[in-house]
């Protein structure tokens, strides 16, 4: 029986061996009485040589007409050839056309197409080599996170997506009818993770989060994947240490396993290699001083948006923290700084090269009365948070957590010009199809 192989397995060591290969036509070039088909699968590309005197007139004519993304199965002999991709090619003896394609809607070089065309045909675009590489890197970053979390004693939990209240502000909730009442799509699993720490102490989850923000920036999606951690007995400084160790492992492990894919997007890997903890830390006050010294029109108490973060990232060649934010610009659940009631014990991790925030974290408010007051100050209904307040009634402890935006991390690692390319099917205010 002829052995079925993947493209990445066609190497000079198989010289003289008969193999069977299934995939899609990437390019089709005729030179005299030979046709050179580049066939791709999920692992790479192989050159298949179709010679008229071997396959016959009928098969040769079929091969001539195969357009890009035609699906085929070929059988043939592996021949070592340093000119071929991977140093070997397949000399075809049999060609089976599963489906012939005459014209593919996406150019051979997708970068020549407009972003709108690529997004309209996203269901086809994701099969192109660079789009596939992005998904492989994303998958590997998550795999690396799981490795580190398992090794460090964290428990994975599975929180709900349908919720009754806001975590990050009511204005950004997606509302939907839930039988005879209303529910919302989750903005974050955080509150449910906080409940889980009283039994499991260190927990994490990977879920989609939804934000009804009409932000049209290169780093916002309305649906994104959220890697969130929560731990009992940790303060802000403890959880920042967890963040940097986790991110460092994710990036280094992905560099180890996906260097080829990363090099499709980055010529220089220095910045990614430079992720050994500890990461630099600056206070919000210091960040304001840096921005003002660079002529940015910002005052103490202002939130730091994409433009301000971009300026700050110019000061660092690796991820770094900004901590100690003003209370009024942060979420209700963050613990007040006991040394300065104007601030909360919160931090953001910013990626260099202009990418900005990839993680938001904080120590959580563990005092019942203070948390209730913050809920009321935000104009929210305490009834929606009765169960959450219960966590402060029965054995409350100091605890902290954070959320990592997976697509933001992918965008930085691969130096993408827009976060939408890090999502399989991106959701933005302007796009819900396909």
UniProtKB/Swiss-Prot annotation:
Keywords: Aminoacyl-tRNA synthetase, ATP-binding, Cytoplasm, Ligase, Nucleotide-binding, Protein biosynthesis. Belongs to the class-II aminoacyl-tRNA synthetase family. Its main location: cytoplasm. This is Asparagine--tRNA ligase. It is an enzyme of class 6 (ligase). It comes from Pyrococcus horikoshii (strain ATCC 700860 / DSM 12428 / JCM 9974 / NBRC 100139 / OT-3). One of its GO terms (cellular component) is cytoplasm. It catalyses: tRNA(Asn) + L-asparagine + ATP = L-asparaginyl-tRNA(Asn) + AMP + diphosphate + H(+).
């Amino acid at each position: 029986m002829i052995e079925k192989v993947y493209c990445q397995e066609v190497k000079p060591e198989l010289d003289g061996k008969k193999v069977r290969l299934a995939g899609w036509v990437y390019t089709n070039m005729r030179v005299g009485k030979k046709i050179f088909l580049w066939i791709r699968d999920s692992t790479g590309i192989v050159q298949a040589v179709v010679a008229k005197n071997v396959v016959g007139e009928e098969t040769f004519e079929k091969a001539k007409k195969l357009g890009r993304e035609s699906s085929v199965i070929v059988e043939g002999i592996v021949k070592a050839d340093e000119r071929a991709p991977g140093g070997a090619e397949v000399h075809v003896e049999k060609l089976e056309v599963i489906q012939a394609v005459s014209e593919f809607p996406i150019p051979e070089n997708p970068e020549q197409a407009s972003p709108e065309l690529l997004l309209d045909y996203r269901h086809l675009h994701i099969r192109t080599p660079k789009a596939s590489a992005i998904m492989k890197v994303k998958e590997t970053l998550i795999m690396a996170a799981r490795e580190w979390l398992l090794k460090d004693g964290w428990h994975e939990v599975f929180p709900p997506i349908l919720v009754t209240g806001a975590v990050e502000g009511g204005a950004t909730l997606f509302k939907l009818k839930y039988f005879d009442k209303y529910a919302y799509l989750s903005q974050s699993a955080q509150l449910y993770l906080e409940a889980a720490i009283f039994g499991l102490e260190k927990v994490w989850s990977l879920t989609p989060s939804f934000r009804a923000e009409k932000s049209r920036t290169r780093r916002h999606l309305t649906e994104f994947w959220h890697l969130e951690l929560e731990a009992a007995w940790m303060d802000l400084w403890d959880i920042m240490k967890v963040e940097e160790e986790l991110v460092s492992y994710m990036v280094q492990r992905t560099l180890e396993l996906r260097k080829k894919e990363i090099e499709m997007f980055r010529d220089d890997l220095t910045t990614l290699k430079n992720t050994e903890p500890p990461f630099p830390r600056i206070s919000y006050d210091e960040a304001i001083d840096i921005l003002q010294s660079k002529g940015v029109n910002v005052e103490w108490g202002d939130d730091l948006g994409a433009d301000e973060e971009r300026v700050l990232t110019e000061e660092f060649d690796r991820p770094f923290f900004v901590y100690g934010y003003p209370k009024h610009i942060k979420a209700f659940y963050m613990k007040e700084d006991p040394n300065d009631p104007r601030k909360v014990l919160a931090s953001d991790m910013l990626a260099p090269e202009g990418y900005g925030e990839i993680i938001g974290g904080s120590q959580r408010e563990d005092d019942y009365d203070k948390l209730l007051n913050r809920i009321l100050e935000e104009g929210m209904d305490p009834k929606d948070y009765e169960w959450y307040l219960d966590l402060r009634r029965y054995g409350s402890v100091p605890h902290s957590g954070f959320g990592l935006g997976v697509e933001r991390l992918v965008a930085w690692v691969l130096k993408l010009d827009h976060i939408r390319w890090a999502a399989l099917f991106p959701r933005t205010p302007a796009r819900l199809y396909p």
